[in-house]
């Protein structure tokens, strides 16, 4: 909008700690202000106070606090706020009730069924936002024309629907009145398939408003997209947060005369667009604050740097936000914040828990930064409030922060300066731990000075912050060195040069208002109105007219809404989007056609097909031309151009830059004299050679040695970053370098995983995330394994080591291996492992290996899905690969691997693979993931040298070994102190009676143990046999859980233990034994036995509840959650995957739209968790109604033996598999069976609960009590970090 002459424009970023005010004053000059967001002794509202102060300063008239401000001189107010974010983090929103379709009362509690932390035995409870749940009697399903079905109705997607049950409003009325009587006035209404049939939600909403509910969020209005779980979470967040936001808005308006009636007031949404205050809702507000910063650098740095892609680096007190801009905003449509999944357009902002307030630890030989934070109170040690040592303290010790440049607001009276002495004292305690380790550790080394320790922590913090940047760039096919680093936030300037140098970037751009760039972004942002509706059309010429009609209607809505806000049509632009995916896949992309004009073979709005293919190829590296393209949603984004034009011209330099003073800063080579400049005294053209410090009122910029800063013609700081010199690291163990390599190795495995997820085609890998990626040393020992699927953890290294021994010298450059055989380290046949040996110039043998293991949905065998319940030989379970060259001499062996995948069809009663296309596509994706790993390790070797990288592969394994030895010693010492023997044992049984026996003997002096499984049952005539690699996976998983903190996950974890497994037993069967159940069932029992021996927690559900459904037309496989075991200090979580799996479950609406089933019920199974001082988690009940004839297979455990309790805790309930025939007969299927089902049959799955812990008659201890079992740390809290807008 135009700027009325002589009036103020305010842009305000209300952060968690500080509020930044950016004002364009009459005449065009700029005034900025920073004040505390909370200061009740002086003012009620920080944004109002900021406006008052600037008006008072500019007008020269006293404006008393508490009196409504005159708005005649105010043209506009724009605000970004963390009000919604803070309410979500602190759970201070409105009291909410959830109204959901009957049978789904616990759907949002169960969610995806995956647990957030793979190795946390105390699985945190889901933090749902609703207080009560009402089930609504109604049901809509997709129409399939079964006999007896009523007339279909058409949903707004175009799908035909069957109304099985209309809404029973009378039954609902009394329940709603009861909610009102209990003080609940906000509702979230979430009904099945309401994205396409909104009428039922609308009827419920109308009734609720008539009864007096003050806020009702209908999921079909908040975000009308398929997938009820994220849509439901989004509706709940909206109902929880919108009343809080509206109360804040109303309170803000009361601070002005006329309640801002004649002032344009706009709020920043999570998608980077502004919205009128009356349309500002909770589900769109969670990233309101961070979004302003992205808009800020996109409108400044990107254009000032000639359109070069930009990485935004916003470092605050407790976390760092990174984002990317390359000419258009990058949005995601589903993301989690504070434990809540939101399905709404949001800028793609990645957060890492490393900021100025991140705490510093030295643990088992590693420098560790975060994720714990000192917070605002007590804050870092230098705040003089007894806080812990943090990154800020390390920078202060190094001389990179100057106490004199900060106000005296610290200490108990908030009237003292920063304290370098407190920082040094706190860091000295950590330095003592470091030097004690260096003196007495496994590799004695010279001690480190206090400054060297501080420098080490800063380097590790920098590497931690590089990881999400690599994920935004390298993992998506972008070169990080081709980007400019835009640095903002209070703490970022101290680290920008080092971050850019580590990523190979040439330029750092720091805006002159970088300390309040989010507020500047608000001033420069446009007003946005979006309209979206679901769709279910194929993208074909026959549907183009319908798509154009829908897009035109949505465009008209956007234009009308913006014109109502005062924008002339000439200032309004629109952009159309289609949410497209290949049929049969779950990965949809929201694509715009603005760079693909319409052709004769496209809709009038543009060639979305060409845009989709181009984007799909860029994102995933392949396309699927034989599959039709489907439109899931149509969307139009309308923009009213209103950003202010800044005319604040910087002064021209008239001489050399003035040095305020010279200080001493510590760098890699020691202390150096470092000039200090004041940003306000620098002018255009000034050039500053590093090292130097540039200080302004809001931030400190460190220009490191070898870098050069200049002041641009816009008054910004551009730093030319010198190339990183060759690494000075050598092969000797350096704890600092070890910590950095730990991050680098893990980053490699993580990026391999992202590439595999991106390039795979199958639901199992792309959506259920049933895969793992890892890096291995030249001996095949595991170096780094990203935490994907636990059952893969220890098994993959057995696979790599088998190939090394089996092939010997028959490994050549360009070879890629494929294996799945249990005797070669395989888990079960559908888990195909792809291994790439990596050669290096001058080396005759591979210098390392990378591998990826993925679960393929079908590789043949006697049943669809290759998970037969009654297999007795390995051949019945599918195609077998002992050692197969998938790629030879750089050529993909498609013909040979196709023949091998079809080979099971030659065996009587078996079939070859039923989905060859997906097999081949996923195998290529695994090869591509391995190639990414090779590239990244090659870069690491190029930086450090082969000898150093291989040495640190060994050091990182030794570090994991040390952590496990420390844990074993702590466990043994604890038992010894209580007069207990150093030998522990446990025994449990499979449902067929086969025992799993374990005896553990601890060697206290060595910190080692013998795990002896002698006494375990013999190999069985069935498929519960678990290959040796499975037992090792279970063991490494348990050891990692028992350590209780983040450690490198590698072969070193097994070094302190000797494992005895009897040959020919159920845990080490013969090569041809059937094993499919061993991987998914016996593995869980092995974990229960190990954890039971250590007394760490009670038994989990002990099962993955494998369900397979298939016929000639389709195939479907799922694993289903149950109850987690309770432990010393925590209740077991209900409805969650535990231990050896963590795969997601298909969303109910996707399930019903893709497969011939109706999910009638999916909820918790009350009372199935074992009673105890701490109660075991409940299992779930899942009921499937079949709509076609199909073969149902179930492969389950804990149907005979209950999950045990510990220390007086009662066992969890057994599972139960029932089939209810259409004629009413109920049949118990038992634990393992295949059965033909017919339309109208119902499968009822009751999964087991977890065991209880402690005598149920003992009261649970109050919060904060010491753990009952002191050998292991108490864990289980999900720490949420408030995003700091400003920090030291």
Swiss-Prot record:
Coiled coil feature spans: none
Phosphoserine PTM sites in chain numbering: 1265
Signal sequence, start to end: none
Primary site of residence: cytoplasm
GO BP term, example: glutathione metabolic process
GO molecular function: 5-oxoprolinase (ATP-hydrolyzing) activity; ATP binding; identical protein binding
Cytoplasm listed as a keyword: yes
GO annotations of cellular component type: cytosol
EC code(s) of this entry: 3.5.2.9
Comp. bias (Pro residues): 1259-1270
Record's function text: Catalyzes the cleavage of 5-oxo-L-proline to form L-glutamate coupled to the hydrolysis of ATP to ADP and inorganic phosphate.
Record's subunit section: Homodimer.
Protein name as annotated: 5-oxoprolinase
Species whose genome carries this gene: Rattus norvegicus
Lineage of source species: Eukaryota, Metazoa, Chordata, Craniata, Vertebrata
